[in-house]
Each structure stands twice: as C-alpha cells, then as structure tokens.
Amino acid sequence: MRASILLFTFLFIAHAALAGDGKQYGKELTVKEVTKISDILAKPEIYNGKRILVEGNIVDVCKERGCWIKIASDKDFESLVFKVDDGVITFPLDAKGKKAHGEGVLSVKTFTKEQLIESGKKHAEKEKQEFDPASIKGPKTVIQLKGEGAVID
Amino acid sequence: MIKWRKWNNILHRDIGYTITMLTLVYGISGIAVNHTADWNPNYQLQKESFSLEPVKGTATPEMKQNVMSQLNLKDEPKSVFRPDPETIQLFYQGRTYTVDIPTGKGIIEHVRPRSVLFEFNQLHLNTPKKAWTWFADAYAASLIIVAITGLFVLKGKNGITGRGAFFSIVGVVIPAVYWIWYQYL
C-alpha cells in the first residue's frame, strides 16, 4: 500500500514537472526577427550557414528519437526540417499541430545521385525496408535547420 | 576494531534505500530506450484507415470544413497543413487526420504517451533539464558511492579479498573485452 502511494506520488510529481505549454527545448532563443520559411526555400543560398529563427506549425516529428520536427511554411506545400543532434533535444511526438519557434543554423547540401543511392540502401537496411535505386532520379538539395533551441506553444 | 566498515555499511545501506526508486526508473527506462529501433518507448502509435467521399473545395479552409463535416468533427483542429496539392492534414491533440483529397481515403494516427514509461524516460534522459540535472548528478554520485562502499560491506571469504574479487574482476573483464572486440577486431 505504502509502496503504491509512493509510486503514484512520484509519478504525479514527475508528470506535473513535465507537463505544460510554451516549453523551451535546448538553448534559449536569441534571434528576435523571424525569417519566413517560404523566403528560405525560395533562396536558400542567401541563408546558408546563417543563424535564423523560424516559426510555424509542427507537421511531423521523428518517431524514433524525437530528433527532428518538420515546421510548416507560411505557404502551402512547403515545410522545413528542424534537426537536432540525437539526445540533445527530444521533441515529444504529440507536438504535432502545435506552433513552434525554432532557432538554428541553416544547412544547404547537394547530394549526388550515387550518394543518395548509397544512403538509401543503408537506410532501407536499417529500417528493414525495400529500396529501389531506380527511384533516385538525380542529385538532390537538402535544406534543413541545424536546430539549437525551440519553444513549442 | 576500526569503525570505517561500520560507516561504510551505513552509507551503503541508507544511500541504497534512498536511490532504490530512481535506480528502478533508470533501469527500466534504460531497457526501454535501448531498443528504439524496434519500438517507440515513449508513445503508443495507432493508425486506422477510413474512407470518405472525395474532398470538396478549392481552397484549404473549404477542404478543411468538408473533411470535418464528413468525419463529424465538431472542434476546430489545432492546425491544418497541405503537404502537397492532393493531401490535407488536420491536427488535433493526440491525433492527426491525413486525407487524400481526390479519393477521400485517409488515415487517423493516434499518439498516446505510454503510462509510467513516458515519465520514467523523460527523467532518465533528462528532458526537463534545469533542476533535474542536479538531481541526476546527485543520483550518479550516489551510485558511485553505493558501488564503492558495496565492495567493502562484507569481510572474509565472501568479501573483496575472496569471492568479491572474482566477481569484481568479471565485472571489469566483460566491458573491457567487449570494447577491445568492438574497437579493434
């Protein structure tokens, strides 16, 4: 009986400590001005390597480790991946649909067809999925924000 | 008779009692998060498919209303997203509706935190940061004290000079051999 009371008290305190909105993840935000995701995606080379702040609704979260979120652009059919190093920040899976402000350094990298096939094979092997190298049609530019801090409403 | 063993055993016993709960938390969570490739240790994910009439409307707000009406959803979603011209997503707390606009076929994804394990994992992985970092440091220091004092609880043939020496060496050899194999072989 006493053990049960202790366990429930512990869980209640832990839950209360972990609950709440407007949560800070990682470092505090320092950039004041928001850059529109649509502007970044339109001319990524301008922002490559720069520290920026973006805002938008979270439309996807890394299911395995919570190590990235996808933030919707201010325009339809666009989004930006906000990627953090594994373990540094763990985003909750139920953050989908919430509004986020994320700060980090923009990374723009172009991968060759061969690099994409190699990486696709490794990913498929890890995920135990099938991979068709023919699905890779050519080089691809990956734009993501190397995230350092975020606030989720 | 020197009194260091008495104080050693008192420290081992009382710190041991104090950290029992946290050791269970870290141990259970440790097993859970070791296997993230096989499951999500924090959340239960469930997907259900459904079928609607093709979604009507030309702009996103109209399409959202049409989907809500077809699914009989009364509450406004937290947000709506169009990942591509043929898909609309409605986000509610703990569930996401993804609908293929031309066919009306869709999927509901339910996300629920796993009871108990969610809290255990958050504490183990120090998600709260701030004060919990200090608690976690104190816990780690306590574990070190319990481990060292544990070596000297017993004396005689079951102590560190007898049986204890054998098992302590086994505890050193296992990680050392594994690391050499992992790093160099």
Question: What role is predicted for each listed range?
Answer:
Chain A
Residues 19-153:
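OB-fold and OB-like single-stranded nucleic-acid-recognition modules
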Residues 4-13:
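Sec-dependent N-terminal signal peptides
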